[in-house]
Amino acid sequence: MINHIATRLPATILSAAVLLLSTFSCNKDEPDGGSSPTPVLTDMQVVQGASTEYLSYPAQSSYEEALRGDNLTLSTTVNVATGTSNAVARWYLIEDIGPDKEIFMEDVGAREGEADYTSSITLTEEQFTELFPSGKFKERHFYCKFAFRSSERDISSTVFTSDTMTISTGLPAELMVLRIDTVNGEEPTCDYVSPPPGNNGAGIRNCTKVPGRLKVSLAGKVLYDSGEYVADQSGMTLKIRGNTSAYSAQKPYKIKLQKKKDLLFRGDEETCKDKEWVLIKGYANLNTLIGLEAVRHLGFSWVPAMQYVNVVVNDDYRGLYCLVESYKRNQKCRVDIEERGFLIEKDAYWWNEDLYFDTSGFPSNMKFTFKYPDPEDIQTEQVLYIQAYVNKAEEEIRNGGDYGKYIDLESFARWILFHDIFATLDCAGSNLYLAKKDMTSNSKLEMLSPWDFDSIYWNGTFTQCWSNQHMYWAFYYPALLSNPNKAFLEKYKAEWNRVRGTIGDHMDRTIGEFVEKYGDAINQSRYLNAMRWGGGFADCNDNLADMRSWLRDRVGFLDSNIPSMK
């Protein structure tokens, strides 16, 4: 058996993509009334089972043109190795509701002995427009049935049915597509809340978790299907996440699977699988990719992995996102802490949490909240322990004491060095995550990977300045960098000397390779994202050029200033 897809689209295609996937299987149905000579499907590609072939097309000049090609032709061929006579092919469109719709039939004709039978269907511009309305993401599913009638017995036939042929308009084949269908089409909701006087930010609460089904595909091939929602067995839940980012029309989301899965498909399922994943809006720039790659080069104990994906919820295209591992305890693939360990955040949004604690060493309008243990599971002794431990660390920092007994100097130095390399603007709500492995003196407070990269580059305005975390007293860094105990300053200088000669080349190579491989697909997706939500977007090559220019300037600035720090 062989399958084939032939297509014809306008030569002017420049900005979005049409993706086709066809698989052909040999599902054999023999009607009642006696047997007939059974056609034997031969594998002309010498592979096991059904073969799969897909094609993707370059970008089109406008979203309108992407969905309104002059025509589209699907063609499939089946090879029959024994004598049959007439063959009739019927093409069907799978309807969302009701029986499948027959849209085309043709008499393929008679053959003698081993022969190929081919049937094609062409969608005219009018049909294409009807099936794929302009301005909307849409998937349509087709299949073809070949009915072969014996040359000797015209009362029975053998039918071969193709697997579904999926045509998805508008989404490039190089990026994964996350398709989420919620139960009864329900959308997740949240309430928007403001901070108490004297505090920062605007947040959300009462976020509903909507059950549903998740399918992940690449180039039309389904890589993962969670199945329909059954609590603790299959499916997933979807909810809105974030703080101020949740106020925009395009929402950030959190996905929670009922069964663990590595949605990034890294080839080590047992190690990398987890239930919790986040979708961060990723259309505006490459900041999340650039930030996480720089963090990885600096050598943090764990760095969230990510991929750019397109997201469709209830047949509605939601845009280009970063699918990212969430911050949580998972000793195999995320934050490696013991059951009696801690994952905490110095949090500007503490007022929107059920449990938090304060410390006395460095008064601020930020307090500590818990990522692990869950507030409903934590015991009073655990809260008192970590509060006392952080208070002691702050006391040592404030007094110029032996703070190295309480904080991990290496991770603390790498954290602020990252922000200084990129001159991060954000100071208060910049996702200050810390971990302590257990409740013993064998572990220290560790700074975890930076997370929020929206304000790196100081928005591209200033190259000759420190990060705000370096300069302002929102956290410990001004005290550590100017401390009479120079242990931290020396570690900070050592970390810069370790990476200063490699950071530029590493970022140039890794981000350059990424843009070469995925840049066109991301640019196409950014265009579709803008069509869906409005706003402008930059070209990935411009993002790459900006990063290269920035790092050249920053290495010079840091080389001129770090050695003289006292």
Regions found by a protein language model. Give the residues of each.
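Middle-to-C-terminal accessory/interaction subdomains
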Residues: E186-P188, A202, S234, T244, ...
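Internal "kinase-insert"/substrate-recognition segments embedded within catalytic cores
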Residues: K256-D262, C272-G282, L286, G299-P304, ...
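Surface-exposed, flexible coil segments in extracellular/virion-facing regions
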Residues: I97-T129
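Solvent-exposed loop segments of extracellular immunoglobulin-like
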Residues: T82-A89
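Conserved NTP-binding catalytic cores of kinases and kinase-like/nucleotidyltransferase enzymes
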Residues: T169-L286, I290
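Short, solvent-exposed loop/linker segments at the N-terminal edge
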Residues: E53-D70
